[in-house]
Amino acid sequence: MAKRVAIVGAGVSGLASIKCCLEEGLEPTCFERSDDLGGLWRFTEHVEEGRASLYKSVVSNSCKEMSCYPDFPFPEDYPNYVPNSHFLEYLRMYANQFNLLKCIQFKTKVCSVTKHEDFNTTGQWDVVTLCEGKQESAVFDAVMVCTGFLTNPYLPLDSFPGINTFKGQYFHSRQYKHPDIFKDKSVLVVGMGNSGTDIAVEASHLAKKVFLSTTGGAWVISRVFDSGYPWDMVFMTRFQNMFRNSLPTPIVNWLIAKKMNSWFNHANYGLIPEDRIQLREPVLNDELPGRIITGKVLIKPSIKEVKENSVVFNSSPEEEPIDIIVFATGYTFAFPFLDESVVKVEDGQASLYKYIFPAHLQKPTLAVIGLIKPLGSLLPTGDTQARWAVRVLKGVNKLPPSSVMIQEVNTRKENKPSGFGLCYCKALQSDYIAYIDELLTYIDAKPNMFSLLLTDPHLALTIFFGPCTPYQFRLTGPGKWEGARNAIMTQWDRTFKVTKTRIVKESPSPFASLLKLFSFLALLVAIFQIFL
């Protein structure tokens, strides 16, 4: 009899988890508290309790070739950076393609997940749900939690002296939907993550004045990177990842700073990060430098004091009149349906082995999927997490002893960044390629570069030097996708299809053959170093 798996949430990770369960012959039941799938990517005019919220203009920060599910490319006529409405439609297509809707119970809230009375023997869970006022309880062999980390706003008002005296309007960025509220107002956005920067830029088109307050600065990059290519298709390659990981940290930091400043000098715009030893993820925004240089956005340091109708910034004695304050200060996360004895969240971190499994459970029958913030898309990350997790839940793959897992979790906690402006989400960050490769190794699905070099050198070169697109993650092993090779070899065709809307003649490069030869030799050297 197939094992029954309860999946909490029908967002991007929940959908991947349903599919992975079906692939392994398990029986998934997904509980979604809202009336539709999509999670974060489903825009609504009003904020819904327990669900991530986004503003109308949100566009993906990862391009379509880097942010799709590994066995389901975006339609080729989609723009390279996908608006939220297109993204939601893509998720609907994914659910229909793999017949996932039959496994989802909508308008069903998970009230509690507790250990069954014989958990130490069976590993089973009691799941209590509420649907249209009716409460039900069922026993499941395993549970996959896919609720994400963007539902509980982090609003540290105690860090802003005088905020209680402010007579204007203030709210967390989670409440933001449209820029109309900023028309002819003086606006202050606190926090320079992607959301804070987006909101400041949007506000600057309508507001009287916009201030963007940042504690530590940030590197800002455009979606349009070298030679007009999508930033992540240039930046995120196996070759570059190996190169960065093989150099001393100061050199890597210097190289990254040089690259970041190639668009504009961050120091001249008051943006250069104060802590250049501990690199923060870059902020993606195509307009910010232009808004700053035209005086539409003013970069300010942290807030010293909030007054009735104004704000005083650190290192600046002047009071700046303010009508609206938007706190883009990030999120915390919690599992209200789980007891602390199952997953304890402390100081913004959960004791999860590889960001997935509670390290102390007697039976590895509960997995958390998507509670991670890679410098890359969550779709392929969640899919890879789910593939491994499902095989552990099924009993095909085994976890290390609890003591080993706890030690690794504790080590990660000790290395956690700290300080206001980093928020709890920083504790969830990981090295995208290295992390996914590690999980792929556990299920024997990591591409074997040496073998590919001998059997399919063209593919090997493309995988190593080209963008690390998700198709690589289902090239081999359990859940292998037969279309993976073709998707890899045609990834640039789909990228340019939506930009080359006017045909132009191109001259062939005389150096193309030499470049291919150099790439082949470089790959040989890299593989030789790996096997030394």
Curated annotation (Swiss-Prot):
Annotated positions binding FAD: 9-13, 32, 40-41, 61-62
Recorded family membership: Belongs to the FMO family.
Underlying gene: FMO1
Cofactors demanded by this protein: FAD
Cytoplasmic side of membrane: 532
Binding site for NADP(+): 60-61, 195-198
Tissue-specific expression: Liver.
Keywords annotated in UniProt: Acetylation, Endoplasmic reticulum, FAD, Flavoprotein, Glycoprotein, Membrane, Monooxygenase, NADP, Oxidoreductase, Transmembrane, Transmembrane helix
GO molecular function: flavin adenine dinucleotide binding; hypotaurine monooxygenase activity; N,N-dimethylaniline monooxygenase activity; NADP binding; trimethylamine monooxygenase activity
EC number(s) given by UniProt: 1.14.13.148, 1.14.13.8
Protein name as catalogued: Flavin-containing monooxygenase 1
N-acetylalanine modification, residue list: 2
A single cellular component GO annotation: endoplasmic reticulum membrane
Role played: Broad spectrum monooxygenase that catalyzes the oxygenation of a wide variety of nitrogen- and sulfur-containing compounds including xenobiotics. Catalyzes the S-oxygenation of hypotaurine to produce taurine, an organic osmolyte involved in cell volume regulation as well as a variety of cytoprotective and developmental processes.
Catalytic activity: hypotaurine + NADPH + O2 + H(+) = taurine + NADP(+) + H2O; hypotaurine + NADH + O2 + H(+) = taurine + NAD(+) + H2O; trimethylamine + NADPH + O2 = trimethylamine N-oxide + NADP(+) + H2O; N,N-dimethylaniline + NADPH + O2 + H(+) = N,N-dimethylaniline N-oxide + NADP(+) + H2O
Compartment annotation: Endoplasmic reticulum membrane
Site feature Important for substrate binding, where: 208
Record's bilayer topology term: Single-pass membrane protein
TM segment ranges: 511-531
One GO BP: taurine biosynthetic process
Sites carrying sugar chains: 120
Originating organism: Sus scrofa (Pig)
Chief location category: endoplasmic reticulum
